[in-house]
């Protein structure tokens, strides 16, 4: 059974910098998946429960973060990682949510929303607006 997660990105505080997507990944479990874009949204389509995707953002001030979304045991989850070094790409971060990796505990929490403030004061939030079913939706907010 396939799942999709459609993300809408909102940037509320341009003084913190404008964030652009610089990388997209999909983990290979559950037949992997794909990212697509339409009308300003980013949609992760996955082959089944048990996989995820990561978007890596960089601001025009050099701040790097990742937003991870996925489905684990038929339930959505999300995470934001801040304070990244240039070599900490989405390709590096995505597998850390699996196989007892350092971020696996976050996936297993199956959070419907998560927020964090970076060391430089930028607040990041992911909040699912459609939390059940196979066609999930979430807002990603930078402020």
Swiss-Prot record:
Binding annotation for N-acetyl-alpha-D-galactosamine: 49-50, 72-73
GO MF annotations in UniProt: carbohydrate binding
Disulfide bonds: none
Pfam short name (any one): FB_lectin
Biotech exploitation of the protein: Lectins can be used to recognize and purifiy specific glycoproteins, and for the purification of cells with specific surface glycoproteins. Has potential as anti-proliferative agent.
Binding site for N,N'-diacetylchitobiose: 79-82, 103, 114
Sorted UniProt keywords: Lectin
Gene3D superfamilies per UniProt: Cytolysin/lectin
InterPro entries (alphabetical): Cytolysin/lectin, Fruit_body_lectin_fun
Binding site for beta-D-Gal-(1->3)-alpha-D-GalNAc: 30, 49-50, 72-73
Protein residues bound to N-acetyl-alpha-D-glucosamine: 79-82, 103, 114
Protein family membership: Belongs to the fungal fruit body lectin family.
Subunit architecture: Homotetramer.
Function: Lectin that recognizes O-linked galactose-beta-1,3-N-acetylgalactosamine, a disaccharide (Thomsen-Friedenreich antigen or T-disaccharide), present on cell surface glycoproteins. Can also bind chitin, N,N'-diacetylchitobiose, N-acetylgalactosamine and N-acetylglucosamine. Inhibits proliferation of colon, breast and liver cancer cell lines (in vitro).
Protein's name in the database: Boletus edulis lectin
Native organism taxonomy: Eukaryota, Fungi, Dikarya, Basidiomycota, Agaricomycotina
């Amino acid at each position: 059974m396939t799942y999709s997660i459609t993300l809408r990105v909102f940037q509320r505080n341009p003084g913190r910098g404008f964030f652009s997507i610089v990388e997209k990944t999909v983990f290979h479990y559950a037949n992997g998946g794909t990212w697509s874009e339409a009308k300003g949204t980013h949609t992760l389509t996955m082959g089944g429960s048990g996989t995820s995707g990561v978007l890596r953002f960089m601001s025009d001030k050099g701040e790097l973060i990742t937003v991870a979304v996925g489905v684990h045991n038929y339930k959505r989850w999300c995470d934001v990682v801040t304070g990244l070094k240039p070599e900490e790409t989405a390709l590096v971060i995505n597998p850390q949510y699996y196989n007892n990796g350092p971020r696996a505990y976050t996936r297993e929490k199956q959070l419907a929303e998560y927020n964090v403030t970076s060391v430089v004061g930028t607040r990041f939030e992911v909040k699912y607006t459609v939390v059940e079913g196979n066609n999930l939706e979430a807002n990603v907010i930078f402020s």
